[in-house]
């Protein structure tokens, strides 16, 4: 997977953990499968822009913050 997908995944995990959320917590909030989120956080899946927007909203950050 691309470097940008890996960076996105690392950022999602970092922000999620900073906010005290487990992967399961985030997945329940987003109504998505935990295996999918695991793949996103590990850089193995590249989520759509719509999914990135949902993740940003669930984590209460901007899309820009996720992409840094």
Question: Where are the predicted features?
Answer:
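A detector for short, charged/polar N-terminal pre-domain segments
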Residues: 1-7
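Short amphipathic helical patch at the helix-1/turn junction of helix-turn-helix
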Residues: 6, 17-18, 46
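Short basic helix-loop element that most often maps to the first helix and adjoining turn
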Residues: 10-29
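Conserved hydrophobic/aromatic packing and binding residues within compact polymer-binding modules
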Residues: 12, 26-27, 37-40, 66
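Recognition helix of helix-turn-helix/homeodomain-like DNA-binding domains
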Residues: 32-46
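Short, conserved catalytic or interaction motifs in soluble domains
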Residues: 42, 61, 68
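DNA major-groove recognition helix of helix-turn-helix/homeodomain DNA-binding modules
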Residues: 50-65
